[in-house]
Amino acid sequence: MNKPAKWIVRHRDKAPTVPCPCGSSTRILTRADGQSVVNLHVTHIQDSRLHYHKKCNEVYYILEGAGTMELDGKKVELTPGTVVYIPAGTRHRGCGDFKTVVVGTPAIEENDEYFD
């Protein structure tokens, strides 16, 4: 594991954007930065796949666009300014086309994404 970080400063423009099951994700703060407390991503969701995490809790803050979030089979409307807390174990997916800040705690591990 990397040496624990004292502090981290990074601009979104300097963070890598990668494809993910949700669309594309700019990984601003991750476990690879030497900390395991939290991750922070800006994700462009385009009809993501239903999935869940066994360890990671997530908070979504909708920046732009609109859609719905499916949470254990229930759909909720999403518009800019909406916050959604998703505890570990909740099957979820975003439907539509929107950008969101995703905060995960503890920082998500690569193998903590499960599909039914």
Where in this protein do the model-derived segments appear?
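Extreme N-terminal tail/first-helix region
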Residues: 2-20
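A short glycine-rich, His/Asp/Glu-containing loop-to-beta-strand
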Residues: 14-50, 103, 112-114
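A cytosolic small-molecule/anion-sensing beta-strand core signal
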Residues: 41, 63-64, 79-80, 96
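Short, conserved beta-strand element in jelly-roll/cupin
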Residues: 42-45, 54-69
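His/acidic/aromatic-lined binding-pocket segments of jelly-roll/cupin-type domains
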Residues: 50-52, 57-62, 76, 92
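Short strand-coil-strand connectors
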Residues: 70-74, 97
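Short acidic-glycine-tyrosine-enriched beta hairpin
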Residues: 73-89
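Ligand-binding loop in jelly-roll beta-barrel domains
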Residues: 88-113
